[in-house]
Amino acid sequence: MAENRMSDGSDDRAAADPASAAALFDRARQRLGRAPREHLGRLIVPGALRAAMGARPRVVPDGRAWRVGTLLIGDTAVHEVGDVLRASEERRRGFTSDAARRRAEAEAMCVRGGFEPGTVVNVDHTGIDLSALAAEGASGPLSVRDGTVVIRWTSSGAVMPLEAYLREKIDMLPT
C-alpha cells in the first residue's frame, strides 16, 4: 500500500475529509505564528434616538486576524475578506466619484470607532462555518469537490485545494 504523504510531510487523506478543514486551519495558525495580523472591524449604526442626538455610524474593533489571500484566519474563527480600509481622519476634500466619497466616509468611521489613522481595518468580512462545510459541502469560498476541500480564490471562480492554497499564501507572507 502506497504512503499518502505530500511533499510538505502532511497526509493527503486529511484533505479529503471536509471536517479536516479545521485541522488545516489549525496547522496554518501554527505556521503563521508571529506573522503580522490585521484588525477586524464591525459597523455600529446608532439607533434613531442616538442618531437624533448626533451619534454617527462607526467601525469598532472586533478582533485581529492574519490575512491569507482571500481569508482572514483568527485565533478561533475563519472569515472571507470583505472590504479593506485604511482608517483616516474625516476632512473636507474634493471627490471624483461617489464611490470615493463613500470610501472616505467609511475610513472616517474607523477613526470614530477607535482605530488610529493609518490602521488597516477589515470590515464586512463573512464568517466561514466549518461545520456547515462538513455537513453541506460548502461555506463561503470553501467547498468540497471529489472529496477534497477547495477554495474559490478568484471572482471568476478559479479553485484550488485548500491545503495547497494555505501553504502557498503563508510562504509568501512576511514573518
Predicted ranges, named:
Residues 2-31, 37, 110-175:
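Low-complexity intrinsically disordered segments
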Residues 50, 89, 96-98, 167-171:
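Generic alpha-helical propensity signal that fires on short helical segments
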Residues 60-111:
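Aromatic- and glycine-enriched beta-alpha-beta binding-site module
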Residues 1-4, 10-66, 84-91:
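A composition-biased, non-transmembrane "mature-region" signal
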